[in-house]
Amino acid sequence: MHSRGFWKRYCIKTTLTERIRELSDGEVRIEGRRVNELSSRERNVAMSFENYGLYPDFTIYDNIAYPLKIHKESPEKIKEKVMDIAKKLRLTNVLYVKPAALSSGQKQRVSIARALVRNPDVTIMDEPLSHLDARMRSNMRSVIRHLHEKLGLTTVYVTHDQIEAMTMADKILIMNNGERQQVGTPDEVYYYPANVFVAGFIGTPQMNLVPCTIRRAGKETTIVEKGAFEVKTERYADSLDDGKAVIYGFRPHDLEVSREAKDGFFKGTVYVTEPLGETTIVSIKAGDIILKAELEGNVYDLVQDQEIYFGIDDKKAHLFDAATEMRIIPGDE
């Protein structure tokens, strides 16, 4: 069973979920069963959407219970299931009011409850947490993931929020402008991004992506950003031609900062610091570019325009072809 995240905005992700719900061409199989000719209800697919889709004249109890009544479950079983999901989603105190009396966040939770209450074969969730505040969103991520694992649900989860995708998904489908960019586990898309788009989209702070040139001298290969750094690499053997245009990607936490000059480090100046409590984001000006480093703790001794030195961990860095923007696979992978 997999939970999948489709994103980002305007990439026909909702159109894809509609095809799962009601395909007009091709083939869809759910639990090994061809469902093309079946209606949405017969496919046993439940849905929760950003715009709620609640019945305004029904109480919250009846909204949640509706799919169970359609499937002709007994009143006793309906009550048991509704009360159970309402408790999990913190809705027990609003079960006997109508949707107009609820906040947008509560309506969102009712929509989720109605989707999950009947234990469908597939659940489609289209940005179900978009109207919740940060605290409730974090709690609901845990609740949905818990129910997903407990009930063995297959969930197609649409989101533009990478945190939701990374924390909740077993596999992620990343899309841009209607085209698939990468399919993989959270670890795969984070540690082995297929292209520049995925590399820049996954991870906070964003990966440093720097246009560079390859310089070859005998068997020695150097990644050069003129005026900023020259990093020697042995990971790509003879696969890189002299003068090749590449994009060098490395995450902020793989950038080491020193107050003093060190072998293999490059000179820069502090552009700005952003203290976040457990970490501090330091923007470093090197030549004509700005790099971001993520350092542990609050770093109070770095001030704007201060001269510092930085080192790049090449073993954790990535190279992308500047023309295709696809990742170049190193020889040690």
Residue ranges: model-predicted function:
Residues 2-11:
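Walker A (P-loop) phosphate-binding loop of ABC-type ATPase nucleotide-binding domains
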Residues 12-14, 110:
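ABC ATPase nucleotide-binding domain helices that frame the ATP-binding cleft
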Residues 17-18:
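Helix-to-loop junction immediately C-terminal to a conserved catalytic motif
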Residues 23-27, 177:
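Conserved coupling/switch loops of ABC nucleotide-binding domains, chiefly the family-specific signature
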Residues 26-34:
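Conserved ABC transporter NBD signature motif
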Residues 43-46, 50, 54-197:
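ABC ATPase nucleotide-binding domains
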Residues 207, 217-333:
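Non-catalytic connector elements of ABC transporters
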